């Protein structure tokens, strides 16, 4: 008898050793003091429940102290510390996952890793397997562990038969319970991809004994029941009942169910996981989003799933129904992504007050619920599907409201932009003539820069679909700094090519302007030499005239000359004399080329000629005094006017003045600008109408872009019209008439956008062509050839060149900023 008892005792010891060895084999990836600490906690759980509460308090205190050391100061957690903690947990704000991550999994840690890659916090490498690729490393760990288990635990398989039976309700692996306890405490610290899924509020969590074992199955291990004799099975069943009485750490034995519900707000479904299979989202019983829960639909696991549902007690189902009704009556903030301020507010705590350890223990269930429910993570594909479904599910009344809002917003936008044409009225009375010339030169260049920049940087890329931001990568890893730069080049490829085209236009403008400046200064030096020579000759002629004997002849001698001429008409004699003198002077002054004479030269010639005629004019006055004839003065003035008129039209090239345009009426350039401005406003209306028909956000963004380039464009057009010879009133009237074309374009664009969406891109292309024509054909030649009259107001070519360059570069910069950052302009206006 003694031998038999001894043999039985040895067999029990052997089985205990094998179970312990297999447990160590499965948990082999835990090393260091922390693993020993968890093993010590697991051994503590085997002791009676009176010691479990103390161990749970110690563990809670240990981890809270660690968190407070990392995020707090002096035993208190500040608002910013808690905000940093929530950020590291992926909470506090809703984030959209845009990267395709089917190979990385859909658990919370994988989402955090993808968001970190997406935000540029760290990068994955293609060449080797990164430590953040949690799913692959985890699968390799599971494979290696299972292999070691198969090799080291074969004696157990030889002596003990392993089977899985769905009708066995009381068989529960103690090691699974132990690992369940480890994973509960180390979920936030453990670097894996498995998210801990707690069951619904069970009797064991309330400290009550339960005959129903836990149905949770880990993804990285297999659930197996050991087939033992009936007596051993009963003992093992009793042991399972004792283990079920162990209190889960963090919940005291006398914790009431209602109190737990009040603090935690946690209602989790039954979740069953099978290793090696992907998760399929199924609806939860607590009324949350269907994409929250994970359920495996593997055919081999259907029996286990039916077994789980079969073992559910009636009171558990009733509790689930009650909790569902409570959830429906709860506030919506429990199903939202809460930031720090909202979280503290719902707990009745101010944002400026420090957070104690006791309060933090109350916050932990809410944080775990936010993590488990994935309330702060959204998929980009899901958002697109929701938008499409929302558009499909629109009621006819909603569609009518959206159409009406597009028309109303388009009309308001066009009205505001059209009022920019009245800004010229404010500028004209305030600015004097000199400053206004500077402003006109700058605004003309600014209009050219904004229109050509808008065409090449904004409209053409849009017409080619260059702003499609649905950039999805087939791999959720492998990012580097070089890849980021390549992504930028690919995303803004059309914009950068348009910028290069603008650079070519600007380069040719600089070259042509420099050539014109060189020729101008060369001509100026030649003119100065000729004027110096001419002044010397004129001074000699004036000295000869002053020394002429006629100057010393008395008046009686002048009176005696009339009979010698054969007539008594003094006027005719004087005309002949003047014609002789003027003919000589004209013969001397015909040497310089007529095409290079400007207004300053005419003034100099006029002044020198008046000096030569001064003596003759004095003698005419003396003759008129003696003969009482007043006709001499009139004839002389008429003749001098005819001479000046003959020399005032020597130049019709770059030195023409604005008075020539006024004498001939409104120039062709003015009418072309008016027509171009009207077509421009029509195209603006088309673009704004098409954008508002697609959505309010895009319409407002397009309106801002049009406003930014329309402001300098309208002022530039106003300046060109004034330079062409129009009055201020005429320029305002024509600007308002051209602005009316924008309303017609907006009506057509809105109608086309609502009923023919594919034509919108073609509208952008046509608008770009119109912008380029107006800027490069009408306004750029005005910059190059229309500023010759500025010399009479003290303008120099270098100053004009600087102002024009500033206007062009500033216009290019405005359009480049809009093209690069237009996607950041987001408005959500609802009517």
Curated annotation (Swiss-Prot):
GO terms for molecular function: monoatomic cation:bicarbonate symporter activity; protein tyrosine phosphatase activator activity; zinc ion transmembrane transporter activity. GO terms for biological process: epithelial to mesenchymal transition; intracellular monoatomic cation homeostasis; intracellular zinc ion homeostasis; negative regulation of B cell apoptotic process; positive regulation of B cell proliferation; positive regulation of B cell receptor signaling pathway; zinc ion import across plasma membrane; zinc ion transmembrane transport. Residues 126-318, 464-484 are annotated as: Disordered. It is a multi-pass membrane protein. The chain crosses the membrane at residues 411-431, 438-458, 495-515, 687-707, 732-752, 759-779, 801-821. Residues 172-188, 229-238 have a biased composition (Basic residues). It catalyses: Zn(2+)(in) = Zn(2+)(out). Keywords: Cell membrane, Glycoprotein, Ion transport, Membrane, Phosphoprotein, Signal, Transmembrane, Transmembrane helix, Transport, Zinc, Zinc transport. It comes from the Eukaryota. It holds the Pfam family Zip. It is found in: Cell membrane; Apical cell membrane. Zinc-influx transporter. When associated with SLC39A6, the heterodimer formed by SLC39A10 and SLC39A6 mediates cellular zinc uptake to trigger cells to undergo epithelial-to-mesenchymal transition (EMT). SLC39A10-SLC39A6 heterodimers play also an essentiel role in initiating mitosis by importing zinc into cells to initiate a pathway resulting in the onset of mitosis. Plays an important for both mature B-cell maintenance and humoral immune responses. When associated with SLC39A10, the heterodimer controls NCAM1 phosphorylation and integration into focal adhesion complexes during EMT. Belongs to the ZIP transporter (TC 2.A.5) family. This is Zinc transporter ZIP10. The gene is SLC39A10.
């Amino acid at each position: 008898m003694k031998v038999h008892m001894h043999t039985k005792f040895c067999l029990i010891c052997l089985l205990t050793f094998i179970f312990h060895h297999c447990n160590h084999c499965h948990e082999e990836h835990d090393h260091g003091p922390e693993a020993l600490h968890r093993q010590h906690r697991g051994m503590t759980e085997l002791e009676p429940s009176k010691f479990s509460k103390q161990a749970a308090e110690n563990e809670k205190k240990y981890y809270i102290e660690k968190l407070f050391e990392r995020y707090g100061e002096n035993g208190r957690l500040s608002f910013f510390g808690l905000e940093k903690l929530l950020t590291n947990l992926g909470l506090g704000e809703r984030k959209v996952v845009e990267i395709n991550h089917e190979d990385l999994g859909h658990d919370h840690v994988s989402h955090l890793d993808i968001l970190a890659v997406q935000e540029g916090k760290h990068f994955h490498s293609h060449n080797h397997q990164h430590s953040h690729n949690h799913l692959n490393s985890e699968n390799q760990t599971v494979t290696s562990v299972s292999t070691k288990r198969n090799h080291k635990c074969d004696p157990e398989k030889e002596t003990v038969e392993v089977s899985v039976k769905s009708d066995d309700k009381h068989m529960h692996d103690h090691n699974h319970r132990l690992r369940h306890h480890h994973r509960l405490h180390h979920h936030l610290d453990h670097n894996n991809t498995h998210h801990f899924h707690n069951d619904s509020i069970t009797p064991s969590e309330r400290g009550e004994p339960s005959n129903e074992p836990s149905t949770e199955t880990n993804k990285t291990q297999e659930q197996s029941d050991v087939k033992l004799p009936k007596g051993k099975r009963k003992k093992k069943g009793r042991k399972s009942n004792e283990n079920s009485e162990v209190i889960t750490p963090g919940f005291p034995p006398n914790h009431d169910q209602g109190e737990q519900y009040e603090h935690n707000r946690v209602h989790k479904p039954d979740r069953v996981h099978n290793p090696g299979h992907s998760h399929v989202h199924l609806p939860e019983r607590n009324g949350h989003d269907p994409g929250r829960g994970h359920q495996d639909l593997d055919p081999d696991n259907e029996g286990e799933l039916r077994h789980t549902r079969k073992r559910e007690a009636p009171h558990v189902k009733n509790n689930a129904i009650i909790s569902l009704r409570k959830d429906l009556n709860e506030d919506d903030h429990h199903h939202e992504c809460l930031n720090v301020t909202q979280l503290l507010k719902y707990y009745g705590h101010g944002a400026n007050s420090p957070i104690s350890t006791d309060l933090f223990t109350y916050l932990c269930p809410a944080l775990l619920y936010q993590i488990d429910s994935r309330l702060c993570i959204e998929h980009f594909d899901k958002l697109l599907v929701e938008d499409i479904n929302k558009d499909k599910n629109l009621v006819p009344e909603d569609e009518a409201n959206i159409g009406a809002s597009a028309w109303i917003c388009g009309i308001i936008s066009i009205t505001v932009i059209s009022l920019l044409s009245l800004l010229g009225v404010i500028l004209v009375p305030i600015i004097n003539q000199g400053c206004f010339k500077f402003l006109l030169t700058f605004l003309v260049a600014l209009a050219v820069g904004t229109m050509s920049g808008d065409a090449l940087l904004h409209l053409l890329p849009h017409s080619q679909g260059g702003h499609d931001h649905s950039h999805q990568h087939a791999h959720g890893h492998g990012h580097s700094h070089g890849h980021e730069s390549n992504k930028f080049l690919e995303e803004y490829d059309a914009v950068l090519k348009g910028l290069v085209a603008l650079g070519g236009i600007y380069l040719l403008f600089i070259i042509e302007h420099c050539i014109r400046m060189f020729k101008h200064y060369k001509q100026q030096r030649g003119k100065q030499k000729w004027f110096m020579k001419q002044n010397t000759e004129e001074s000699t002629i004036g000295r000869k005239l002053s020394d002429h004997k006629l100057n010393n002849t008395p008046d009686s001698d002048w009176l005696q000359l009339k009979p010698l001429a054969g007539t008594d008409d003094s006027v005719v004699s004087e005309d002949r004399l003047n014609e002789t003198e003027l003919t000589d002077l004209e013969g001397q002054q015909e040497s310089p080329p007529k095409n290079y004479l400007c207004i300053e030269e005419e003034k100099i010639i006029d002044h020198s000629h008046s000096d030569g005629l001064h003596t003759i004019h004095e003698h005419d006055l003396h003759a008129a005094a003696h003969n009482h004839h007043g006709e001499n003065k009139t004839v002389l003035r008429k003749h001098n006017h005819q001479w000046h008129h003959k020399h005032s039209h020597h130049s019709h090239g770059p030195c023409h003045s604005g008075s020539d345009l006024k004498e001939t009426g409104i120039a062709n350039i003015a009418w072309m600008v008016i027509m171009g401005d009207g077509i421009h406003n029509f195209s603006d209306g088309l673009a704004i109408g098409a954008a508002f028909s697609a959505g309010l956000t895009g319409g407002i963004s397009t309106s801002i872009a049009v406003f930014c380039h329309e402001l300098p464009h309208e002022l530039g057009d106003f300046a060109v019209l004034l330079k062409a010879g129009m009055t201020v009133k005429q320029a305002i009237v024509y600007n308002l008439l051209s602005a009316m074309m924008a309303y017609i374009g907006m009506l057509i664009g809105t109608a086309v956008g609502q009923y023919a969406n594919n034509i919108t891109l073609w509208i952008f292309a046509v608008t770009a062509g119109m912008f380029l024509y107006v800027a490069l054909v009408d306004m750029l030649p005005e910059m190059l050839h229309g500023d010759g009259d500025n010399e009479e107001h003290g303008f120099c070519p270098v100053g004009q060149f600087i102002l024009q360059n500033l206007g062009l570069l500033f216009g290019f910069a405005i359009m480049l900023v809009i093209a690069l950052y237009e996607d950041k302009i987001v408005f959500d206006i609802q009517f």
